[in-house]
A protein has these predicted regions:
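Mature catalytic core of soluble alpha/beta enzymes
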Residues: 1-257
Length: 257
């Protein structure tokens, strides 16, 4: 996926086979889905060399989910278009989905307290140690070595996810369908929720929506957003307040989104 993978597991040593399986899965996804690889299924599909019904089950699943998300977001999440590499690029969903599936592999091997970070797409569960939350830092959109805000995640029954879309990521491929232009109102949009696949896609859509992104996210049960506009002014949903407040009272280091 052209990104760096970071993993912190606090459950003791997991079997080497679990790590190998997770990395193997992510490598396989990159080989099949990357629009930058001429021989990938996605590239061949974009060129019309294969039909969607002849693609692998995973590719067909992703195409179906992306089409559903296009409808859910009123076209603000769209994997097809002239501004996308080859006219077809599902990366805005695939990355989060692939990392989430890798987390399933680790959990099947016994991981219950971990953070998995793939180039800023973060999925986490449990806690680093008893009485402390995981801390995730939202990257400053203009200063890559700075953190714009910190979010704290207390231990819960399931996993949580953080995904960001912004100018430093792939905004040149994010287009407002109303005017076919790159969004001009925001520098970044971060989404928090239980599914990394959806958080990734929602961040892309909400970034494209500009100032309407946060109100739209408020209508997505379980999801909340943190936006930074062109004047570096932050704004966020009410549901995100608890994560910000918890981080303000914690002294732990932040893992950058």
């Amino acid at each position: 996926m052209g990104t760096v993978i970071g993993l912190d597991v606090r459950d003791g040593r997991l079997p080497d086979e679990a790590f190998e399986a997770a990395i193997g899965w992510l490598t396989d996804v990159d080989l099949r889905f990357s629009p930058f690889r001429p021989g990938s299924e996605i590239s061949r599909l974009a060129r019309g060399e294969v039909a969607s019904e002849d693609c692998s089950p995973d590719v067909r699943f992703v195409l179906t989910r992306c089409e559903a998300l296009r409808g859910e977001t009123d076209g603000f999440f769209d994997i097809r278009g002239p501004g996308l590499r080859g006219g077809l690029d599902p990366s805005g969903y695939v990355k989060g989905w692939a990392v989430e599936e890798a987390a399933h592999i680790l959990e099947a091997a016994g991981a219950r307290n971990y953070v998995l970070n793939a180039g800023g797409d973060v999925v986490l569960r449990g806690a680093p140690e008893e009485g402390r939350p995981w801390i995730v830092g939202i990257r400053h959109p203009l200063e890559s070595d700075q953190v714009a805000a910190r979010l704290a995640f207390e231990p819960g029954p399931g996993r949580m996810a953080v995904a960001t879309s912004g100018l430093y990521e792939r905004a040149g491929h994010i287009v407002n369908p109303r005017n076919n232009e790159v969004p001009a109102e925001l520098l970044s949009m971060t989404v928090v929720g239980p599914s990394l696949a959806l958080a990734d896609a929602y961040a892309t859509a909400a970034f494209a929506m500009g100032r309407e992104g946060l109100p739209w996210l408020a209508s997505r049960p379980g999801y909340a957003g943190y936006a930074i506009d062109r004047e570096l002014r932050p704004s966020w949903n009410a549901d995100l307040e608890s994560y910000l407040a918890a981080a303000a009272s914690s002294t732990g280091p932040a893992r950058q989104d």
